[in-house]
């Protein structure tokens, strides 16, 4: 699963996930893309699960790009532990997603197959998504 090899600090503050995606909102690599319409957090497991659904559906055809990376640690205290005594240990990693962010891209397959594959992948994600095509100016 995806997670940073090393970070400057082990734990991060929760923070806020406001605004729209300023970067990573255009289809850069592939022909078709899955774009987030809602805001939220994607865990490394969810990103991997959707990637597997994509690769299994397109089989050997096409190339897939993952445009998000889980770089934020989420901590959790063990069960039945009283409050206080410091922050919990890192439980999993998340990518914070703003509306407009491109999550996955694909090329080398037909539009129909890409739509089917992205529908399967979107079912694995906790966000509302949309299918977008690359626009060449």
From Swiss-Prot:
Family matches, as InterPro entries: Ribosomal_uL16, Ribosomal_uL16_bact-type, Ribosomal_uL16_CS, Ribosomal_uL16_dom, Ribosomal_uL16_sf
Biological process annotations from GO: translation
GO cellular component, one term: cytosolic large ribosomal subunit
Subunit-structure text: Part of the 50S ribosomal subunit.
Sorted UniProt keywords: Ribonucleoprotein, Ribosomal protein, RNA-binding, rRNA-binding, tRNA-binding
The protein's role, per its UniProt record: Binds 23S rRNA and is also seen to make contacts with the A and possibly P site tRNAs.
Transport listed as a keyword: no
Similarity section: Belongs to the universal ribosomal protein uL16 family.
Protein name as it appears in the record: Large ribosomal subunit protein uL16
Gene transcribed to yield this protein: rplP
GO molecular function: rRNA binding; structural constituent of ribosome; tRNA binding
């Amino acid at each position: 699963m995806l997670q940073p090899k090393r970070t400057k600090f082990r734990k991060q503050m929760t923070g806020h996930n406001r605004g729209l995606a300023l970067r990573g909102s255009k289809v850069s690599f592939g022909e078709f893309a899955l774009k987030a319409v809602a805001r939220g957090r994607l865990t490394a497991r969810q990103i991997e699960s959707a990637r597997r659904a994509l690769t299994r559906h397109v089989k050997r055809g096409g190339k897939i790009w993952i445009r998000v990376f889980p770089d934020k640690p989420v901590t959790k205290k063990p069960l039945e532990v009283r409050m206080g005594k410091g922050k919990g240990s890192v439980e999993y990693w998340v990518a914070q997603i703003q509306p407009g962010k491109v999550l996955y891209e694909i090329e080398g397959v037909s539009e129909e197959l890409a739509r089917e594959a992205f529908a399967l992948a979107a079912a694995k994600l906790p966000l509302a998504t949309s299918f977008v095509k690359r626009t060449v100016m």
